[in-house]
Structures are given as C-alpha cells and as structure tokens.
Amino acid sequence: MTAETVRRNAVKVLFVDDEFIEFRALKKKIADLSEPAVEVEYSQSIGDALEKIRAERFDLILLDNRLLPNADFRETVPELRGIGYTGPIGVVSTDISGGYFQEFPDYGVDFRIGKDEIDVQALQHIIREYVTYDVPDFWKDDYSI
C-alpha cells in the first residue's frame, strides 16, 4: 500500500492548541464521524506542530488562535506557511468576533471557526470545502440539482 493510498483512507488533521482538554473535547465531538474517516493528531505548541509537519503530511490544520506565550494566528500561521505547508489552515477560537479576524486571509488562513461550532457536520463541511478528498457516492446527492 502506498502512502497516497493510506492518505486517502483517512483525512489527517493536526489540531494545535496549548490546552490538551480542547483536543479531548474535539475528539469527543467528532467520535461519531465515520465518513470520511478522520485521524486527528495533537500538538501543544507551534514548535511541536512545525516538527510534525516537517515529518509527515497533514490534509488540514486546525490552529488555536492564541498559543502561549502570546502568539496569535498573525504570528503562527506565517510560520506554518514558511516551512512550506500549503494545505488548508483554520483558526479556531472561543471568540471570532474580534476585528483582526477580518484580516485572516492576509496571513494565509483559509477559514475561522468558533470552538463551540465544531461538530461532525461542521468538520464534514470543512473537509468538503477545503480538503482534496474522494467524496462518497451518498454525498454526491447533495450536489445534484
């Protein structure tokens, strides 16, 4: 089995948040997600995320807006893009209403989402919109007119 074949079997997501409890909450929210299969890995810091991205391929990154000590997406996303990551990056935050969130495309962010908005349907939508993935036949009905 080639790496590309394995990659197609599961969408690989890197969740970057300085609070492990947020990762556990995400895993619990998406536990019932069966299609597509999703493999979620965790990084507690931007440094750890950079190491993982250099070592393996991820289809999607969900990045907490604020990582300690005080870096927000305007600092962390350029670091991810700077090492060559070209896949989709979504900024996740408890509050996405701040004015600076309107600037997210300028920093290489593809989308933003509130932590309270993430569930099975939201993740399926994100994968449909941003990740190259072979859509299952039963999803294709959603796109027919």
Regions found by a protein language model. Give the residues of each.
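Alpha-helical interaction/dimerization surfaces of two-component signaling modules
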Residues: 29-33, 52, 103
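Conserved phosphotransfer microenvironments
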Residues: 61-80
